[in-house]
């Protein structure tokens, strides 16, 4: 086809259903690890990455009820702090588990996504940001092993570039950190705003989400919440 001819002038009407955003659902599902209370989500997209993440959380001992586009996540009885390599290698978003686990339990162990070495993917920006909050990391046999001496402590963190994943990881970790955390050069995507809104419903104190500077005042615990995932802007076009 050499050309495409479009004849306008006709009135456009109707509607289309757009499923929930995968890039919003993944960090929000992970955020459930911060609390012992139930998190109910709706408009959850039925895509492979979400299904893999559900499998990963179940490996941790999280109870999850999945019906159509709804999730009921009950993370009160987490029994395992080491992520399964077979699941992690399938999805980069698994690195987001570090922040919540370190914040709530003070330790986490996760294989490098895809078995990659540091530097081949932007994992280092996650580790650098979490280190500013007081986390310590070692790389052992292809695993990232993180620990916290007592509790994560709020700090001023300036990202070298507005990484969406790093912003999400640091944001989640800082929710239970002691004191205030300031994230500068933060990502401003709608998915960051959606995650922040869900965390606020859970009891987090967050300001500035959707801007390049996010302020988080740490809290001691979170509460049960319900949240609807935003529609996928990529699918909507």
Which positions does each model-derived feature cover?
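Structural preference for solvent-exposed beta-strand-turn elements
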Residues: 1-237
């Amino acid at each position: 086809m050499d050309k495409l001819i479009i004849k306008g002038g006709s009135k456009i009407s109707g509607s289309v259903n757009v499923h929930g955003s995968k890039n919003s659902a993944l960090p929000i599902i992970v955020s459930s690890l911060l609390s012992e209370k139930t998190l109910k989500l709706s408009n959850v997209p039925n895509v492979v990455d979400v299904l893999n993440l559900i499998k990963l959380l179940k490996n941790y001992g999280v109870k999850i009820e999945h019906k159509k586009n709804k999730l009921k996540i009950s993370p009160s009885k987490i029994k395992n702090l080491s992520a399964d390599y077979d699941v992690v290698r399938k999805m980069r978003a698994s690195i987001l588990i570090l922040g919540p686990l370190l914040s709530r339990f003070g330790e986490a162990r996760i294989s490098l996504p895809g078995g990659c070495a540091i530097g081949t993917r932007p994992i280092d920006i996650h580790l650098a940001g979490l280190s500013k909050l007081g986390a310590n990391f070692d790389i052992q046999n292809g695993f990232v092993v993180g620990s916290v001496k007592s509790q994560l402590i709020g700090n001023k963190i300036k990202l070298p570039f507005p990484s969406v994943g790093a912003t999400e990881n640091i944001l989640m970790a800082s929710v239970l950190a002691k004191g205030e955390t300031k994230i500068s050069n933060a990502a401003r995507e709608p998915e960051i705003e959606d995650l922040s809104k869900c965390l606020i419903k859970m009891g987090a104190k967050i300001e500035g989400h959707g801007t390049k500077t996010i302020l988080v005042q740490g809290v001691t615990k979170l509460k049960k919440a319900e949240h609807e995932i935003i529609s996928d802007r990529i699918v909507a076009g």
